[in-house]
Amino acid sequence: LTASLNFTHYRLNNWTYNTFENFHQGSANDINLELRIDRNSTDNPVYTRRGSDFSFSVSLTPPYSLFDKKDYSDPSLPIADRYRFIEYHKWKYSGKVFLPLMNPATVKRTPVLMARVEGGIINSYNKYKRSPFGTYYMGGDMMSGSFGNYMNETIGLRGYKNGSIAGANYDYAYSYMKASLELRYPLIFEQSTTVWVLGFAEAGNAWADISRYNPFDLKRSAGIGVRVMMPMIGLLGLDWGYGFDRPNGYSERGGSNIHFVLGRDL
């Protein structure tokens, strides 16, 4: 169990993109308390063969709108005043379970089945004072060059283009869910280098309106990939994924996509 008090200051100077709830000019302050619970019983941080990894966190800002005597329902309230102190409560969970298909004590290069689920919600105390920051950008390989995504949280979903689920058109989400199943097999499992291939099936979605959150309305994909871990370089990877669904009502299905991995896994 860990607790931390965090402060982030944002300053926008003639920000031309419609990224943050029409917030283009001014400053914003984020003061929040984060509480986090983690449990990790995995046997290897690189190529995990058995164990589980669970985490749950909540971040809370003071509910300024309850006591600052501002009418946030007034559309004439200046944007800079509306977001001078941003407020939210943000909840996130994640869990991974690794199951070896052979006994790791006798078979070093055992295939491993990994199941994962994660999700998050960022909500407001006042519906007229939603946070423009900390929202979710979903789809692709988390290596997008989208404007403003350093102020948002990027969630990968293979088989779909970067930001096609949420964020590509500044339609950032306030909730998301993702579930994955991977079958991994190590080609090389040594201290100097670890290489493994994988097949995956996953599904996820993100919603701008929290009331539309539906864990059964997910965008599905499947594919194959390879990972290489070298101590002096870090984690490298390449995936091919096929998205079976339409990211939204007016686009084509995800289709065939290539994804790159650098530093952190999808």
Residue ranges and their predicted role:
Residues 1-23:
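Transmembrane beta-barrel wall of Gram-negative outer-membrane proteins
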Residues 1-2, 43-46, 102-105, 188-191, ...:
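Repeated loop/turn-to-beta-strand initiation elements of outer-membrane beta-barrel proteins
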Residues 16-187, 199, 207-209, 260-265:
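C-terminal outer-membrane beta-barrel translocator/porin domains of Gram-negative envelope proteins
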Residues 104-105, 213-215, 247-252:
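Short proline/glycine-enriched turn/loop segments at secondary-structure junctions
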Residues 117, 121, 229-266:
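Predominantly the C-terminal beta-signal and adjacent terminal strand-loop region
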Residues 158, 204-221:
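Outer-membrane beta-barrel transmembrane domain signature
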Residues 174, 193-194:
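Hydrophobic alpha-helical transmembrane segments and adjacent short intramembrane/lumenal linkers
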Residues 184, 221-227:
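Short glycine-rich, acidic/polar surface loops and turns
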